Amino acid sequence: MASNNDSIKKTLGVVIGLSLVCSIIVSTAAVGLRDKQKANAVLDKQSKIVEVAGIDANGKKVPELFAEYIEPRLVDLETGNFTEGNASTYDQREASKDAERSIALTPEEDVADIRRRANTAVVYLVKDQDEVQKVILPMHGKGLWSMMYAFVAVETDGNTVSAITYYEQGETPGLGGEVENPSWRDQFIGKKLYNEDHQPAIKVVKGGAPQGSEHGVDGLSGATLTSNGVQHTFDFWLGDKGFGPFLAKVRDGELN
């Protein structure tokens, strides 16, 4: 009987030991995978920023290009002024969920359907020999199915679009998902964000923008609600609750 008990104890000991070892292995692998996923997310974001900045790679890797040409800065959206803080580690999405670091938008203000807006935003200055060449603005707004996240590169006049890219969205492939199509995005190049009265003027036009339009781009075929989402994204982020105050300072030449 004692021998049977000893055998059971040994078996249980082996099982418990194996379970602990497996648990440690799984936990270690999960932590390693999470770190790798974070690193990949940072690299992907940097890649999109370098792309929309129009930087020639010249055989260099993305992190090297980002470090050489891109300067992240924090902007107080209320005043449009640069503010202190670590722009490289600041998480704007997380800040927008924190009541102390964000504001709730009224239905009238929330044209992009984002609900809350962080008090501080990251902008990316594209520099060449310490002179700012462009500024990249992160914008997001609700499409048909998803929140759509974009980077918009603007010339130092604070008004002319240099490039745009959508780096995260979940719209219908072949329809709203065409926000990522380069031929559609290229329509934004050279468009003016504001009219002569400094009011947001970008228009996503259903059926197609008039040829030579200074502010208009074609709506996405078969994706009216996604197109509306793009329109509302620009309406919000170019306005007083978005980058409006900051871009006014850019227009006044405060970048250089």
From Swiss-Prot:
Activity regulation, free text: This reaction is tightly coupled to the Na(+) pumping activity and specifically requires Na(+) for activity. Inhibited by korormicin and 2-N-heptyl-4-hydroxyquinoline N-oxide (HQNO).
Keyword terms of this UniProt record: Cell inner membrane, Cell membrane, Flavoprotein, FMN, Ion transport, Membrane, NAD, Phosphoprotein, Sodium, Sodium transport, Translocase, Transmembrane, Transmembrane helix, Transport, Ubiquinone
Enzyme Commission designation: 7.2.1.1
Gene Ontology molecular function: FMN binding; oxidoreductase activity, acting on NAD(P)H, quinone or similar compound as acceptor
Topology versus the membrane: Single-pass membrane protein
Catalyses which reaction(s): a ubiquinone + n Na(+)(in) + NADH + H(+) = a ubiquinol + n Na(+)(out) + NAD(+)
A Gene Ontology BP annotation from the UniProt entry: sodium ion transport
Modified residues (FMN phosphoryl threonine): 224
Classification via Pfam families: FMN_bind
InterPro entries: FMN-bd (IPR007329), NqrC (IPR010204)
Cofactor(s) the record lists: FMN
Coiled-coil residues: none
A single cellular component GO annotation: plasma membrane
Predominant location: membrane
Physiological role: NQR complex catalyzes the reduction of ubiquinone-1 to ubiquinol by two successive reactions, coupled with the transport of Na(+) ions from the cytoplasm to the periplasm. NqrA to NqrE are probably involved in the second step, the conversion of ubisemiquinone to ubiquinol.
Family statement: Belongs to the NqrC family.
Quaternary assembly: Composed of six subunits; NqrA, NqrB, NqrC, NqrD, NqrE and NqrF.
Official protein name in the record: Na(+)-translocating NADH-quinone reductase subunit C
Native organism: Vibrio alginolyticus
